[in-house]
Amino acid sequence: MKRVALVALLCAATASADELSGADKLRVVYSNQFSWTRDGLPVVTVRVMEHRPSVTLAADGIRVLPDGEGGPETRGGATWTVRVVDGKPGKVVTHNIVASFAPSDTEKLQAELAKWRAKKVQTRTFETGALFAVKGQVLDSRRILVAAAGTTGGTPYPELVERPRGTVEAVDDRGTVVRNDSILWFEPGPSGLIELRDVDNERGAKETRKYFGKLYVTVDNAGQLAVVNAVPEDKLLAGLVPAEMSASSPPEALKAQAVAARNELLAKIGTRHLTDPYRLCATQHCQVYAGAGREDARATAAVQATRGELLVRDDGGGLVDAVYSASCGGHGENNEHVWGGTPDPSLRGRLDGDAALAARLPKFAQIGEAELRAWLAISPSTDGPWCARPKEAQVNFRWQKTLDLAAVEARLAVGRLRDLTVVERGVSGRATRLHVVGDGGDKEIRGELEIRRALGNLKSAMFVLDLARDGGGHLTSVSVAGGGHGHGVGMCQVGAVGMAGAGRSYVEILRQYYSGAHLRKLY
């Protein structure tokens, strides 16, 4: 079995050495292994830039460490330009995953393997996720994946069979040159910050950003340079929380956001970027992170107030994958209806309200086609769903849009459109299958995100369509009435603000959005 997960023995005690400065730097940066700060916080590696032929860093008193902390170091000028010499891409092989099991499901795993053996199909197993032992409690996020050779239709799984290579060369503003095989570490001076220039921002422009902690520059899978921030969890969250939720939100909502973001950081270890020399990226794919200088004292206070607190499954299954979205539109969605896979008992879609609201709106416990139009007629109000109550609800709780038919037809590539029909919805009414008919044929689009993109980047897949046709049966206009913004799974951020505004605590907020789980202070 190919093992991707490592056992990380996590404790609040001070680490005696920096694990990221061990003898084999590349092995460590490609692994799921954590290092820890002296005061017992995990250090997370986040990619902030990649696919660059060269990068420029600056800081007063910067140290260049070819072998990490404890090895030789160079103190040069304040500005360093780093490039890759003779960079060679890594080699990645993609497998088709046909089944996934918990490590304890040995009988089911063996039955699956036997089924494929009987068909004379070669299989391999891969282990993803991580196993954490924290203060005597084991948190297991591992899954055993079964890949079947020569098959299609499953989930692609990348395996790094050959690491990228090259010489990383750094030159300072005095002409000092430092070279090392595949990686160089940079540690800041007294300010604790390193400046990185020409970072791509969310608008596609380039800007200078500052980062807490260390940066390492290494060869990425394209044979170019990746810049990775090895940042203590509290510093990372201090930047993440106000990027994900307005710092003017009530304190209890910010605390709920801090816990959810912390869970997301740790729950994703070993499940994403499996072929990359870092654990997470700084985009929406993982969590948005723009470095230092984006902190707000109110969000930082929420991070500090919930230090080490994580959502743990009641069944002992490990950390909750505490996903969240901007606005659920008043009803959450099940994880499997958005991303497929196994239903997660902690990510069940339900009415975004208390028992009194549920008693008032019993027919919306599950929203099917028949109820959806009535549901979308509900306007923001102070006695409605949690996400209908705060002022933030005005933007996304309910919305309307007229489709740009020419643009939609160009994307769908079935000729002039004749029909758009939602044929399957999730428990919140979100579309999960859309049937499209045009002069050039028909097709089916699966997945709420793919449907949103196909129809012109709709805010959410909780919508109904009103179609108008000409005498020849072609669509002449499509009006969309919708609710919410985002996938709707897990915590509704506007709903959290609404709950906090009604006097609910962050513990109650988390209980509303993540069932079958409880809070534990683990470090």
Language model segments and positions:
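Conserved, single-site charged/polar hotspot
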Residues: L6, A15-Y523
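Positively charged n-region of N-terminal signal peptides that target proteins for export
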Residues: M1-V4
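Repetitive helical segments and hydrophobic/amphipathic motifs
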Residues: C11-A12
